Amino acid sequence: MKLLKAELLLNGGKLEEAQWLLSTIADADELETIIDVVFLYLDMGYPDAAKEWLDRGKSRYTEDEEYMALTADYLASTHQVESAIIYYNKLIDKSPFNPSYWMGLVKCYFVQEQIDKAIEACDFALAADDQYGEAYAYKAHCFFYLNNSDDAIENYQKAIELKAIPPELGYMFMGISYGNKEEWQKADDYYDKVIERFEEDGDKQSILLIDTYTSKAFALSHLERYEEAHELCEKAKEINPNEGLIYLTEGKLYLAEELEDEAAISFEKAIEINPNIEMWYMIASAYSESDYLIEAKEYFEKVYQINPKYEDVTEKLSVLCLMHGEINNFFKYNKECEHPLEEDMILDLLNSPEHREEDERTLKEVWERMKKENKKKTKGKK
């Protein structure tokens, strides 16, 4: 009863009153009580108060498995990932067939983007319990992260079957995965499943539907069902007319229809709503993917002005400058690339039968300049 009252107080932001109430619990030093209170504070967003209660049991329960699990979960929840990994490994040494400990490890590795280790830990969790749905869900997320669409789809399906992930979320990821495989009809089918779930729940105005409508619209554009795609963008605007993603998608649709002026207007609206670097980059990429290279270069240049180290913007600009015969700008951006084009790569392009005839003069000039610069570097080292 006191835990429930404390939760209500914390919901109202009355931390001190909740702390006093919890301090009056008769069995406050019992491990079960400590566990309940620590998770209450963590769930309500009070990690410092949770730490006080965690420390309360330290001297008495240090080697107790439940207390160690609580400590590991606390460390993971407060982003002390390396320390959490140490505790989860200790717990696994004690109980190697406990899938929840393996899942704790999975989540830590996933946060660290050590995806191969996360997948391996998922496999150990499933070896302990092949019906442990959360392991399938995280394994799916890992494969999705790696752009391994086939394995992601398989694991999302299993996670949905085991009720480890909301179906609408699983279907959304499956739709995106099919889109990554360019299987647009299957992608569209799964977006329909997401929409059906929201409609069944009577939640037709959910902001989550914006992502679904725009993703479905993009899939429909590849199926050349442009009118339906634009209708979906309008439905998304009814939910939130100030969402830049809608206008980004709309711009992509217009590019697919070769309506450059309309695309430009939509992209300008997207920037007006979300003038962040990510939006500039996504618009540049949309132009690039549709072979509007002059516009792509303009938008990538804006990205570079905001942050020269953003994503692979220097790589994009170096290639575009090369294609446009802007040799000085090519060298400027190429020098800043993490993996710059080297002399041998330019020679390969020159020798390739696939290079454009109009590029030959530029490539030869770049190659000759690279040779001279490399000779100077070699002499300087002697």
Question: Where are the model-predicted features located?
Answer:
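Short coil turns that delineate tetratricopeptide repeat
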Residues: 28-30, 62, 96, 130, ...
